[in-house]
Amino acid sequence: MAEVKLLGFWYSPFTHRVEWALKLKGVKYEYIEEDRDNKSSLLLQSNPVHKKVPVLIHNGKPIVESMVILEYIDETFEGPSILPKDPYDRALARFWSKFLGDKVAAVVNTFFRKGEEQEKGKEEVYEMLKVLDNELKDKKFFVGDKFGFADIAANLVGFWLGVFEEGYGVVLVTSEKFPNFSRWRDEYINCSQVKESLPSRDELLAFFRARFQAVVASISAPK
């Protein structure tokens, strides 16, 4: 039987994408938790360019970058399709995946800014949410009638964003401002396939609050 290993961080939305795909396909795998501050030689050898997770190792061969890994899993293993079969729908799914990937840094960085810089960051995130809200009008999922590639690409805004908001005390999403996105987010969180692989919300809150405090302390420390 093919050997499959996944190197990841338990708190990472990018690791979660791969876990979701493997479970959807019914692939048995060994999960290896990495230490952010002391990365293993296996990780550094498997991803020498970026030195980051997730990394999927299949029969000794490493595949990196979460959305690339998802396509690899979809093409390699039997089971339900992750990408749509229709070429146009596949293109749409890849478009929204790229759009969301380009916005990840803006979403995360907003929580580590203060004052005017944070307000600028919020506006950038609001613009992204407006686009998503408009796209999700009268739609249950991003592409087609089932949860798929584009939806899992949106996992950071689907679940982690809410954790960041609560942990850092910065509210970006309300059902009044973004009703369609909020409805989709509820669908995302309650999707049985997703719930099975999501980390504990309470543990994530504790982890990110501690990280936030550490960042603030380092910024405030005398030089």
From Swiss-Prot:
InterPro entries associated with the record: Glutathione-S-Trfase_C-like, Glutathione-S-Trfase_C_sf, Glutathione_S-Trfase_N, GST_C, GST_C_Tau, Omega/Tau-like, Thioredoxin-like_sf
SUPFAM superfamilies for the chain: GST C-terminal domain-like, Thioredoxin-like
GO cellular component, one term: cytoplasm
Tissue: Root tip-specific expression.
Induction: By auxin.
A GO BP entry: auxin-activated signaling pathway
UniProt GO molecular function: glutathione transferase activity
GST N-terminal domain residues: 2-81
Positions of glutathione binding: 12, 39, 53, 65-66
Ranges of residues in domain GST C-terminal: 86-212
Pfam families: GST_C, GST_N
Keywords carried by this UniProt record: Auxin signaling pathway, Transferase
Recorded superkingdom: Eukaryota
CDD domains, alphabetized: GST_C_Tau, GST_N_Tau
UniProt-listed Gene3D superfamilies: 1.20.1050.10, Glutaredoxin
Catalytic activity from the UniProt record: RX + glutathione = an S-substituted glutathione + a halide anion + H(+)
UniProt EC number: 2.5.1.18
Keyword match Lyase: no
Family statement: Belongs to the GST superfamily. HSP26 family.
Name this protein carries in UniProt: Probable glutathione S-transferase
